[in-house]
Amino acid sequence: MSKVSNSGGDSKNTLYCSFCGKSQHEVRKLIAGPTVFICDECVELCMDIIREENKSSMVKSREGVPTPQEIMAVLDDYVIGQKDAKRVLSVAVHNHYKRLAHQSKSSDIELAKSNILLVGPTGCGKTYLAQTLARIIDVPFTMADATTLTEAGYVGEDVENIILKLLQAADYNVERAQRGIVYIDEVDKISRKSDNPSITRDVSGEGVQQALLKIMEGTVASVPPQGGRKHPQQEFLQVDTTNILFICGGAFAGLDKIISARGEKTSIGFGATVRSVDERRIGDVFRELEPEDLLKFGLIPEFVGRLPVIATLEDLDVDALVQILTEPKNALVKQYQRLFDMESVELSFHDDALRAIANKAVERKTGARGLRSIMEKILLDTMFELPTLEGVQEVVISGDVVDGSARPLYIYAERQDEKGNVSA
């Protein structure tokens, strides 16, 4: 029960939170129930607990192992296109669950894991696929950036820090961490800097690949709970990485040229055949990817051998980018409409405006990542003016606005502002 007291000569009753015991003067808000009170801080704490519970899993089947179709159905809600890559990831995660379930049964056959390499041009959804995957599975999941890794003993992060992040995601439960999934982003940035091995020490390239070999294949890693270099005297945790699934992703800029050059016999002199530049899209070229191309790019054979499943992603065309703008649950257009809704203003886009935005992103060759910067530039002036304008009911964006030849149309509650149509 909440406490009520008469302090000194004050005739007013002081109310207290029934959960934490703080008085009404110590908190911003005290909410009254039939016989109890709760403060705003306790409400926030309860919401955090509920959010953590909801994060545990979004997909589960009757047997506790989500089917590939169930995983892909959730990925489809957030990620547009990339059907092949989503199928590969869905099957890999499903098999990961099955392998963990199989471990508890006595069997002569040991199921080995199949680590995955995602290859695709920038802005096609590699990292976003991994982030979405993290939300829908109920095993510990962590993402690591390969560009920050260095060989042991040099300034930078050790590869053991990846396992430390997985441990943190599992709340330092070693058993759960040993069943987790790790996504290593920007793995193309640790390619060998020279075709000739070991001329000089390559601590952020080949050295990192070699350091990753054992933890990707399976070893007992000694992980410092607080980071190894700042606290050398701490006790190490032993984590077996045999059952941790590793997914690596990278843009591999220039790999398409290596693939195109493979198999083409070049000749010189007057009888040489003139070959046109490969005009196919990068995603189409990546479909012909072979492990030998990755070796020429700078990955060492042992590293490629530990990534048996290779999934290639396509570069996004105009139609796919328009879908990305409008269809996913957290689509960019929906995000900006929510921002404008906070100002009690409706934001709408003409179809030609969406296609013009998508065309600009294709020209910049930045994929879906470039859509936000284009939208920000288009809506910047409007977002600057809107809070000080009164009576605006709707803002309409046309194709001319995207091209820069017109200003957004402001529709007021009682009249239309013709000024919005005047050419800039």
From Swiss-Prot:
Native organism: Brucella anthropi (strain ATCC 49188 / DSM 6882 / CCUG 24695 / JCM 21032 / LMG 3331 / NBRC 15819 / NCTC 12168 / Alc 37)
GO CC term (a single one): HslUV protease complex
Function: ATP-dependent specificity component of the Clp protease. It directs the protease to specific substrates. Can perform chaperone functions in the absence of ClpP.
Assembly behavior: Component of the ClpX-ClpP complex. Forms a hexameric ring that, in the presence of ATP, binds to fourteen ClpP subunits assembled into a disk-like structure with a central cavity, resembling the structure of eukaryotic proteasomes.
Molecular function GO terms recorded: ATP binding; ATP hydrolysis activity; ATP-dependent protein folding chaperone; protein dimerization activity; unfolded protein binding; zinc ion binding
Classification of source organism: Bacteria, Pseudomonadati, Pseudomonadota, Alphaproteobacteria, Hyphomicrobiales
Protein known as: ATP-dependent Clp protease ATP-binding subunit ClpX
Domain ClpX-type ZB per the UniProt entry, residue ranges: 5-58
Gene Ontology annotations of biological process type: cell division; proteolysis involved in protein catabolic process
Similarity comment: Belongs to the ClpX chaperone family.
InterPro entries: AAA+_ATPase, ATP-dep_Clp_protease_ClpX, ATPase_AAA_core, Clp_ATPase_C, Clp_protease_ATP-bd_su_ClpX, ClpX_bact, P-loop_NTPase, Znf_CppX_C4
Binding residues annotated for ATP, in chain numbering: 121-128
One Pfam family recorded for the sequence: ClpB_D2-small
Record keywords: ATP-binding, Chaperone, Metal-binding, Nucleotide-binding, Zinc
Gene3D superfamilies to which the protein is assigned, alphabetical: 1.10.8.60, ClpX chaperone, C4-type zinc finger domain (6.20.220.10), P-loop containing nucleotide triphosphate hydrolases (3.40.50.300)
Residues reported in the UniProt entry to bind Zn(2+): 17, 20, 39, 42
